[in-house]
Amino acid sequence: MARYVFITGGVVSSLGKGIAAAALGALLQARGYRARIKKLDPYLNVDPGTMSPYQHGEVFVTDDGAETDLDLGHYERFTGRSANQQDNITTGRIYKNIIERERRGDYLGATVQVIPHVTDEIKNFVLNGNDDYDFVLCEIGGTVGDIEAMPFLEAIRQLGNDLPRNNAVYVHLTLMPYIPTAGELKTKPTQHSVKELRGIGIAPDILLVRADRAIPKEERRKLSLFCNVRESAVIQALDVPHIYDVPMAYHKEGLDSEVLAAFGIDPAPKPRMEPWQKVSDRIHSPEGEVTIAIVGKYTGLKDAYKSLIEALSHGGLANHVKVKLDWIESEIFEKEDPTPWLEKVHGILVPGGFGERGSEGKILAAKFARERKVPYFGICFGMQMACIEAARSLAGVEHASSTEFGPTEEPVVGLMTEWLKGNMLEKRRETGDLGGTMRLGAYQADLAKGSKIAEIYGDTQISERHRHRYEVNIDYKERLEDCGLVFAGMSPDGVLPETVEYPDHPWFIGVQYHPELKSRPLDPHPLFASFIEAAVEQSRLV
């Protein structure tokens, strides 16, 4: 039977509960255990699919097509386990399920209430599908004291009683701020956060305390006394230079040992930390540096590109180099010459996005990369803009555009009205709802033998995750290929273009899917490893 670790946060938000859960999952796996991580989000949206990147950051897409919280990306990258729809739930989805059941009469006329109906729905989500795992880690979104989080906290309180004795452990992540005028770290915010948690009925077993400097032993003893936690269970979580240093740092502080001790597991299997030590060594001892320009439209909030940033760093790890990112708002190129911005970079990446704003700047970035022979990686929207650039500049299609931007006489990119999902035909209308109406999740693609991308993958059949409504129009395939832009990857039915490339360019590849979602520090995605390798070669020419 699985054991459960519930991770809550206090004092302030954005302390890194997701990283803490992911790192703990990695540490348990390093000891040979099977770990699963779930995220419980208190917001009322059914999923983050229609939320603004500025509000929520990246939407992480799973193989089964779920649009989820970006923390699931951390879970996958740290543990290597692919997440699915059953690893993320929101208040919105819970209420939607309950209301649908009430309308069907499933509650047999009972008054539907937060307790027990909402809390039971949460508990069912936590407990379902865990037979193959030794540990299930559940991160509760938000901060203790938030009104939105109350049903979730009540549910995990109840689970502490529902589960067999010693099968639930509560980890509370807090902040210990340093007050410069007093010259000391303060314990009071953590004390009050734990008091709030205990008032709900949850007594934390472990305190994971964020701080920007070492916590003195006396302060740890104080937290132990006032928060009713063993002194050894007051774990300092100090700031580290890189997130992939976190597993080693938490292991050094004894987090995984303390969790296992709380479950009464003694002796515990010894961890195999060599892979994480290797990652840390490569991060801090690079053999060179490359600069990659990210030409995007959400550059003001880096969380909108979280998986992309991580995948580029994985490509750096594979090539023993540091990857420096140069963030460029694509709208700038609509007013200024791109040359001064791009002539010194070693690679250009145009990521996914939605809408017309900044699109012309991305087209100009693709043109610069093509003409100057700079490595170019176009992802989703970035591939579409590269195709529009080729149509305009090489194929003479002067008014080439996308129907996403409005009616056009030359729809090089258009709305997908139908596609195969398994054995079912999915259909969409231009005026349909936005939520859940994209081509989502893992789809297969066939790569042309002898193509550059097939060589990179080492295979001609791949499966990658998608998130898009618009697609390059197959009707323009012949004209674009006549100009040198090869459609090297297609959907198995030969209808949807999946990848494009210029064979005579050092490295110019566009993909309709999102390879960044499957990259891991211990297993970098081949496209990112190859892109950074090409950037290393370019760095010798600049």
Swiss-Prot record:
It catalyses: UTP + L-glutamine + ATP + H2O = CTP + L-glutamate + ADP + phosphate + 2 H(+); L-glutamine + H2O = L-glutamate + NH4(+); UTP + NH4(+) + ATP = CTP + ADP + phosphate + 2 H(+). UTP binds at residues 13, 186-191, 222. L-glutamine binds at residues 54, 353, 381-384, 404, 469. Residues 291-541 form the Glutamine amidotransferase type-1 domain. Residues 1-265 are annotated as: Amidoligase domain. GO terms for molecular function: ATP binding; CTP synthase activity; glutaminase activity; identical protein binding; metal ion binding. InterPro entries: Class_I_gatase-like, CTP_synthase, CTP_synthase_N, GATASE, GATase1_CTP_Synthase, P-loop_NTPase. Mg(2+) binds at residues 71, 139. Its EC number is 6.3.4.2. CTPSs have evolved a hybrid strategy for distinguishing between UTP and CTP. The overlapping regions of the product feedback inhibitory and substrate sites recognize a common feature in both compounds, the triphosphate moiety. To differentiate isosteric substrate and product pyrimidine rings, an additional pocket far from the expected kinase/ligase catalytic site, specifically recognizes the cytosine and ribose portions of the product inhibitor. Catalyzes the ATP-dependent amination of UTP to CTP with either L-glutamine or ammonia as the source of nitrogen. Regulates intracellular CTP levels through interactions with the four ribonucleotide triphosphates. Homotetramer. This is CTP synthase.
